[in-house]
Amino acid sequence: LFPYTTLFRSGYTDLLVNNRSQAPVQELEAAGAKGATQQEIGAQCDVVITMLPNSPQVKEVMLGKDGVAAHMKPGAVFIDCSSINPVASKEIYAELQKKDVEMLDAPVSGGEPKAIDGTLSFMVGGKQEIFDTYKPVLDAMGASTVRCGEVGAGNTTKLANQIIVACNIQALAEALTLAQKAGVDPELVFQAIKGGLAGSTVMNA
């Protein structure tokens, strides 16, 4: 729940929170947030934000039996910060539209450290006017918030991001293995090249 802790610190204090494990909920409750069921969140919140492991979990929480969506009011907005299949994002949005509920798919990059300090990067898909209205909410949790297109574009951009990250990791592994086999200390290679063109956030992670 790190992003939501940052959201709370930024002044969004009227928060209802839910999590599978209770320790993070209790931490936010101690700060002034209120623990709630999925059904209560759907019925009482104008904006619902999720960050879940994958597509099945998002669909279950939102669209499952007595899920959040069943209780959301017309005009409410769902912001999904999970990294899921773009097709699943579009499928969820199609169901939400039947209830006159809007959606932004807004996966993040940056990992736990950036979640803690509020410097995540958000890749967002959704209508321009919905993005413009709720961008301040995402800005409260991140350092970069970019609209990439309609719903599904956020998770498509996240896929592109992960391809680049994976290629960086593979190239870094091969380069440092080459250095080590040639008798050069990989740590010294890292120190020598991290400030040059080969340097990257992936390298420094």
Language-model features, listed with the residues they occupy:
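Short active-site oxyanion
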Residues: 12-16, 46-48, 76, 120-121
